Amino acid sequence: MEPIIKVKDVQYCTLQCPDLDIQEQFLIHFGMHTVEKTDEMLLMKGDGTQPFLEKIIKGEKKFISNAFVASSMDDLEKISQADSFGDIEELSTPGGGYVSKGKDLDGFGVEVVFGIQELEKESAETIPTNEGRKVNRMNQMKRFLKGSYPRILRFAHCGLNAVDPQASFDWYQNLSLIHI
């Protein structure tokens, strides 16, 4: 079966959490940075070009959705016509763009987005490494600052919890949200 659309990547996840302050501190220690915070919503980003990686809404603790990037506006329009997806809406989050929201077979949110503007790439200080017989760093210690956190560059994968794994696999593959 030919997939309905072509998906390029994953973009962000949306979670619901009762305490945004605790979640913000956890994600900062995890290696993310605060983009925007209100009493009801928190947006966090990494060091890469995605405007945000995680959207947290205040409320009872639960998973809301994963967002996938359509290959084109035409693909976003196609997916918006699929049974479990809605009309295209303009995103009000950093980077703008458009979204069609739907639900998978287990009732979890699935967002398909297009047109989100990436940020300019930030340059990161790289520490040379020695590889095999190639010596790029001689007599120099490679030290990390005390308390330094990991660098999160991008939202690159997501997990799924399914009642019927094969049916969910087929559903996501039909939308080209997973590839084998």
Segments from the language model and where they lie:
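Conserved small/polar residues in nucleotide/adenosyl-binding loops
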Residues: I178-I180
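Vicinal oxygen chelate
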Residues: E2, K8, Q16-D21, D39, K45, S84-R151, ...
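Conserved active-site alpha-helix within GNAT-family acetyltransferase domains
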Residues: D21-F30, Q166-L175
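A structural feature that tracks compact, well-ordered secondary-structure segments
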Residues: L15, E54-I57, A67-V69, E111-V113, ...
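Short, structured motif recognition centered on aromatic/hydrophobic residues
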Residues: V10-C13, M32, M44, F63-A67, ...
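N-terminal beta-strand motif that seeds the catalytic metal site of vicinal oxygen chelate
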Residues: M1-D21, S65-N66, A124-Q166
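Catalytic cores of nucleotide-enabled group-transfer and carboxylate-activating enzymes in metabolic
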Residues: D9, Q16-P18, Q23, V35-K37, ...
